[in-house]
Amino acid sequence: MEFNKAQNIIGLRVLNDNVIWLWEKDKSVVVIDPAIHEPVIRYIDENNLYIKAILQTHHHSDHIGGTKYLIERWPNVQVIASSKDKKRIPFQNISVEDGETLNILGEEIKIIEVLGHTNSHIAFFVNGESPVLFIGDTLFSGGCGRIFEGTYQQMYSSLERIKSLPKNTLIYCAHEYTKANLLWALNLKPKDQDIKNKLLQVEKKLSINELTIPFLLDEEMKINLFLRAKNLKEFTFLRENKDLWV
């Protein structure tokens, strides 16, 4: 477990490579994709906080595994998830759809459907001077999510939606995959200086046990081959190549 503070958002590293994000404001906390519950409860108790809401980007067990235990501790918590996932996230009590907006911690949050990794994956976008996107497993620094339930077209379209957001959007994904993704990218683009420079930055952070996420959309568009893909055919080639990468 480790902490990484930016804009009152704390990252807890858990399991092998998951990151649980805690968005804190005035002693209230919004938890994003709690893979497990123990470190969340520990942090909440040690800092005299309480959980206002839980945001679920999708149904995979390493994103919802801690939710039922957090609900037991805070039974009035709002659990926000896609209306398409009522069966797979049965403890949700606020069901949302693409384009819907919510007010949480005094901020307007827009729901963005980002299909591909699953057929019901959503992201949570907080607009403002310093926009924030909680993206789950759709986009990683240097990579994107595997396509388990959706199609290549859906994932490509989801990434295009992300690219249309303000370029200063700070993106919070749910896994620390950056170094592995960049090594794969360099295997395809060995002379790409932007990717080389990014890898050096990432290795420096990892050497002192810092998270390499979140990341800025503007910078990510320079080093992420999936975001640089010019069309569906190019994206499909990259995704299939990445799936075979060991």
Swiss-Prot record:
Keyword flag Zinc: yes
Positions contributing to Zn(2+) 2 binding: 62-63, 137, 175
Co-factor remark: Binds 2 Zn(2+) ions per subunit.
Swiss-Prot/TrEMBL catalytic activity: an S-(2-hydroxyacyl)glutathione + H2O = a 2-hydroxy carboxylate + glutathione + H(+)
GO terms of biological process kind: methylglyoxal catabolic process to D-lactate via S-lactoyl-glutathione
Keyword vocabulary terms for this entry: Hydrolase, Metal-binding, Zinc
Domain of life: Bacteria
Residue sites binding Zn(2+) 1 per the record: 58, 60, 117, 137
GO molecular function: hydroxyacylglutathione hydrolase activity; metal ion binding
Keyword Hydrolase set for record: yes
Cofactor: Zn(2+)
Biochemical pathway: Secondary metabolite metabolism; methylglyoxal degradation; (R)-lactate from methylglyoxal: step 2/2
Disulphide bridges: none
InterPro entries: Clx_II_MBL, Glyoxalase_II_hydrolase, HAGH_C, Hydroxyacylglutathione_Hdrlase, Metallo-B-lactamas, RibonucZ/Hydroxyglut_hydro
Enzyme Commission designation: 3.1.2.6
Function: Thiolesterase that catalyzes the hydrolysis of S-D-lactoyl-glutathione to form glutathione and D-lactic acid.
Family in the record: Belongs to the metallo-beta-lactamase superfamily. Glyoxalase II family.
Subunit composition and interactions: Monomer.
Protein name: Hydroxyacylglutathione hydrolase
Source species of the chain: Prochlorococcus marinus (strain MIT 9312)
Gene that this sequence comes from: gloB
